[in-house]
Curated annotation (Swiss-Prot):
InterPro entries: RsmH, SAM-dep_MeTrfase_MraW_recog, SAM-dependent_MTases_sf
Keywords: Cytoplasm, Methyltransferase, rRNA processing, S-adenosyl-L-methionine, Transferase
Protein species of origin: Agathobacter rectalis (strain ATCC 33656 / DSM 3377 / JCM 17463 / KCTC 5835 / VPI 0990) (Eubacterium rectale)
Family named by the database record: Belongs to the methyltransferase superfamily. RsmH family.
Annotated S-adenosyl-L-methionine binding sites: 79-81, 99, 129, 148, 155
Function: Specifically methylates the N4 position of cytidine in position 1402 (C1402) of 16S rRNA.
GO cellular component: cytoplasm
Protein name, UniProt field: Ribosomal RNA small subunit methyltransferase H 1
């Protein structure tokens, strides 16, 4: 008698971050596996391919949205904040949103349309949020504005986008993969001095000089740094001198800072944010409110300085002297919320 053919074993779902993005984990089908998604979130993790919006209640409470108003979401992303603001409009008024990511913005547009928020109440523009003045001029200004400056989890979780050092992928880091040059291309011709300055200015990297030397030496040898794994390995080798008890944690933080510095550079994030903050007062109607979420010291300092200057000049009637942070409960449920700071301002009447 012939042996019975063994069935292939089903891949056991552990509820953890997928090792390979392309594997069909339940996390990638949230509409079918709500219990699984809730389980992952309850553990303080973000399900793969999803983004959990941060400080939604605090933002909605501050913006004080009324039906009939006109609002602007500077960074559409997964659309969680946008949806919460749309719900407050109760079918009256209009929301405008911008995003430079053609891949994720199309998915979010479809997701929001299926939830009942179509083009009659929501206009999505594939452009940078520093063009807020152009949109404001068309519509007569905004009653409320939100700018969430964080990178969406969908981008981080997709290896093909090159945002994460945890998985192998092309070293890209562009928010819009169709515009500008990738991080790998940026490194191709960068000098040691320029790279050291970039790492220091964009992420306060304490090992900026050592890393800049190691990276540029590798490129000078003809070894292109084209993948996330390649860059991570160079960082690991550069910091191999560290004591064993500290090495793992320091390398992880250094990887985070290095990838952050490159992402800020290739997307011109500081230049875009500076331009946005300059145009923000003119885009708000008298009495209009703006809330901004920052995620690292560089952008937070820029936002704080701009709001304070606007208040002193009489442009804003009030602004946040201190930052508002996510609750301990939210940080426990969403680890990516821990570094978030919320600042706000009210346009003078």
């Amino acid at each position: 008698m012939s042996e019975e053919k063994q069935h292939k074993r089903r891949v056991h779902y552990s509820g953890k971050y997928p090792k390979k993005f392309e594997e069909k984990y339940k996390e990638l089908n949230p509409e079918k596996y709500k219990d699984t998604i809730e389980h992952v979130i309850s553990k303080g993790n973000t399900p793969a391919g999803m983004h959990i919006s941060i400080m939604v209640k605090e933002i909605i409470d501050f913006l004080d949205i009324k039906p009939g108003q006109t609002g602007f979401d500077a960074t559409l992303g997964y659309g969680g904040h946008t949806r919460a603001m749309l719900e407050k409009l109760e079918g009256q008024g209009h929301m405008f949103a911008t995003d430079v990511d053609p891949i994720e913005s199309e998915k979010t547009k479809k997701r929001l349309a299926e939830a009942g928020f179509g083009e009659d109440i929501l206009t999505i523009k594939l452009q940078n949020f520093c063009t807020i003045d152009e949109i404001a001029k068309e519509v007569g200004g905004f009653d409320f504005i939100l700018a969430d400056l964080g990178v969406s989890s969908m981008q981080i979780d997709n290896p093909e986008r090159g945002f994460s050092f945890k998985v192998d992928g092309p070293l890209d880091l562009r928010l819009n993969p169709n515009a500008g040059i990738s991080a790998a291309e940026r490194l191709d011709n960068i000098s040691r001095e320029e790279l050291s300055g970039m790492l220091y200015e964009n992420s306060d990297e304490p090992y900026c000089e050592e890393l800049a030397k190691a990276i540029t030496d590798e490129i000078r040898k003809g070894n292109r740094i084209g993948t996330t794994t390649k860059l991570r390995h160079i960082i690991e080798q550069t910091l191999d001198f560290l004591p064993e008890k500290d090495k793992k944690d320091i390398i992880k933080k250094t990887c985070q800072r290095t990838f952050q510095a490159l992402r800020i550079d290739v997307n011109h994030e500081f230049e875009v944010l500076y331009e946005f903050m300059e145009k923000l007062p003119g885009a708000l109607k008298p009495g209009g409110r703006a809330a901004i979420l920052t995620f690292h010291s560089g952008e937070d300092k820029l936002v704080k300085k701009a709001l304070k200057a606007g208040y002193k000049a009489g442009i804003y009637s009030d602004y946040s002297k201190d930052v508002i942070r996510p609750s301990a409960q939210e940080c426990a449920q969403n680890g990516r919320a821990r570094s978030t700071k919320m600042r706000w301002a009210v346009r003078a009447e």
